A protein has these predicted regions:
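Transmembrane helix-loop junctions in multi-pass membrane proteins
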Residues: 2, 69-70, 82, 141-166, ...
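Extracellular loop-to-transmembrane helix junctions
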Residues: 2-19, 76-107, 116, 175-187, ...
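Membrane-interface "cap" regions at the ends of multi-pass membrane proteins
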Residues: 16-70, 259, 295, 299
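Membrane-interface loop-to-helix entry segments
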Residues: 16-30, 134, 174-218, 228-275, ...
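Extracellular/periplasmic helix-exit of transmembrane alpha-helices
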Residues: 101, 273-287, 340-375
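Loop-to-transmembrane helix boundary motifs in multi-pass membrane proteins
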Residues: 125-140, 337-344, 390, 419-455
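Hydrophobic, membrane-embedded alpha-helices of multi-pass small-molecule transporters
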Residues: 52-68, 228-245, 257-259, 268-278, ...
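Flexible loop linkers connecting adjacent transmembrane helices
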Residues: 23-49, 72-75, 85, 89, ...
């Protein structure tokens, strides 16, 4: 099938979903353009900052459009491109966008409270504590993984037999690294200029584009050739500042500039597919069971993840975006709009991978990021863009997909740690509680734990990320159901995605648990040849996953049970009130 047809179908579906279903949700739940948003009521110049709608949209989109939509869609294509396409469209429209919009809406209507605080208000304190612990650990794991990914992207060296040498991509990677650093520098300049002159519309856009061009010109002419360890240190220093500095000074302007770059990447992919209209070479459907991934249910849903629905998105919606929305009318494009655009990115990644596959359906060699990067860079080259420029641009885009999520999750992790130990009257808090809730202390603890995971092997627990992410989305849907019910709003549209996500999550966790038990049993009953592995290594890799899988199941069930009780109580209270 022609990839152009797939892109056009997806575009029509997603645009119609935003125009009709998204607006129906906004009308059903109730949007008040005259209401004071938390950003206006609690403007503190740091976390609560009134910001125009398109800037908040750029923050939301660049923060949620991480590695997931590209890697997930391409990896899940092992089941065939049609199941992936269907789930991205159905999941994006009725699951992901609804969850993101709902989380943003609930937070804005509750003074910018994060999801953990909403759980306390509508479900109970136990649910809040459990959720915040889960959220913080989740953020630390993402910090470790994405920081390692960013450092690896900029790394200019390869190590062979213990000897480091410059890689073939040293100049390209170094240039992308320098571009990224200039993005950070110009973001601060952008923020200061915006603070003084309050540019908007075309003036703001021109300023952002000028800084983007300058960043690439400087970066491509003065590449920074560092090893992975050095880039890792630089990355953690950056996300420390991104987590503690006021939103307007670094995070928002950098996200705004990055969104323009992402739009350029998406436009390049779309125009390339329009002009070349290559054939989708990946198979339509390969079966309900894949030898390497497992059964299509629930693995397809867990693997596609961010391209259709992601719990992490809700943390961004309720953690940062809700505190910067200037007017409630902007919530639709920020919450629902950013998600459907990410679903479009997942479709484009699928089509690029399909075009790169061989005629017999064999996937292209390399990681999903490499396949996508090479494919889009090839489209740019087709239009006369020099190979070096196209490669640096796509390397920067790939790193930015991870980096913009990384700085967001660092800030969210810091806030989760603070909320875990906070009380209502924090102004009079003293002693250990005041220290633990300090912005700088909580940031250092969060990043230190994330850095520790990069050193001791986060990969041992990373396979559970997909299930944990989907569990997060299920818990958010559970909370939104109670919120809408208690506040007298229609919540029926959440029941189908909630039930399906609970089934997906717990099935995936149970499958993982069984697989880990079998792996440990096999290792215990087998004599492992010397030099291959050890019992300790097997237990660390599988035993740790087993423990975490059990904890996730217990956590999920505990919150679901408490939510059910709260929901039943709200039903009884409403019946008494109407009697």
């Amino acid at each position: 099938m022609n990839t152009l047809v797939i892109v056009l179908i997806a575009a029509v579906v997603l645009v119609c979903a935003y125009a009709f279903y998204g607006r129906w949700l906004a009308k059903t739940w109730g949007i008040d353009p005259n209401a004071k948003t938390p950003a206006v009521k609690f403007n503190d110049g740091k976390d609560y900052v009134p910001t125009n709608g398109w800037t908040v949209f750029s923050h939301q989109f660049s923060s949620i459009a991480g590695a997931g939509p590209v890697t997930g869609a391409i990896q899940a294509a092992a089941f065939g491109w049609l199941p992936v396409l269907l789930w991205v469209l159905i999941g994006g429209v009725f699951f992901g966008a609804v969850t993101d919009f709902g989380a943003l809406y609930a937070s804005v209507k509750n003074d910018g409270k994060s999801m953990g605080m909403l759980i306390e208000k509508y479900i109970g304190k136990l649910g809040r504590r459990l959720f915040l612990i889960f959220e913080w650990l989740f953020c630390c794991i993402v910090i470790a993984a994405f920081a390692d990914m960013v450092a690896g992207t900029f790394n200019a060296y390869t190590v062979t037999d213990g000897v480091a040498a410059l890689s073939d991509a040293a100049t390209t990677n170094g240039a992308a690294g320098m571009v990224s650093i200039m993005f950070m520098v110009f973001a601060v300049v952008f923020g200061l200029i915006q603070k003084k002159f309050n540019f908007s519309g075309w003036k703001e856009a021109v300023l952002g584009i000028v800084f983007i061009v300058l960043s690439f010109v400087i970066g491509m002419n003065f590449p920074l050739v560092f090893n992975k360890a050095t880039w890792s240190y630089i990355t953690f220093v950056y996300i420390f500042f991104a987590a503690v500095l006021p939103m307007w000074l670094l995070k928002q302007p950098r996200d705004y500039m990055t969104t323009f770059m992402f739009i350029g990447m998406i436009a390049g992919a779309v125009v390339g597919l329009l002009v070349a209209h290559p054939t989708m070479n990946l198979p339509v459907f390969t079966g309900f069971n894949n030898a390497s991934l497992g059964t299509m249910f629930p693995i397809l849903f867990v693997t596609v993840a961010c391209g259709a629905v992601s719990g992490f998105h809700s943390l961004v919606s309720s953690g940062t975006s809700s505190k910067t929305v200037e007017n409630e009318k902007d919530m639709l494009k920020v919450g629902y709009g950013a998600m459907v655009l990410e679903s479009m990115l997942a479709v484009l990644a699928l089509c690029v991978a399909g075009a790169a596959a061989s005629a017999d359906g064999t996937p292209a060699a390399g990681t999903p990021f490499q396949i996508f990067s090479r494919g889009v860079a090839g489209f740019f080259e087709m239009f006369g863009v020099p190979v070096y420029v196209a490669t640096v641009f796509m390397t920067m885009c790939v790193s930015a997909l991870a980096l913009t999520s990384l700085d967001a999750v660092a800030r969210i992790g810091r806030m989760a740690f603070q909320e875990l130990f906070s009380v209502d009257d924090m102004e009079h808090a003293e002693g250990w509680r005041k220290v633990l809730c300090n912005t700088y202390f909580s940031t250092i603890v969060t990043l230190a734990f994330g850095f520790l995971l990069t050193q001791i092997g986060y990969a041992n627990i990373w396979p559970l990320f997909g299930s944990a992410n989907q569990l997060l989305s299920a818990l958010v849907l559970v909370t939104l159901c109670v919120f809408l019910k208690v506040t007298g709003r229609n919540n029926k549209m959440l029941f189908p995605p909630l039930i399906i996500m609970l089934c997906v999550t717990f099935t995936a966790l149970v499958q993982r648990l069984i697989a880990m038990v079998k792996a440990i049993q096999a290792a215990a009953s087998t004599t492992i040849p010397a030099g291959e592995t050890t019992w300790g290594a097997v237990f660390i890799a599988n035993g740790l996953q087993l423990i975490i899988a059990i904890l996730l199941i217990v956590l999920g069930l505990t919150i679901v049970v408490n939510t059910f009780k709260s929901y039943v109580n709200s039903e009884k209270n409403s019946e008494k009130a109407s009697a």
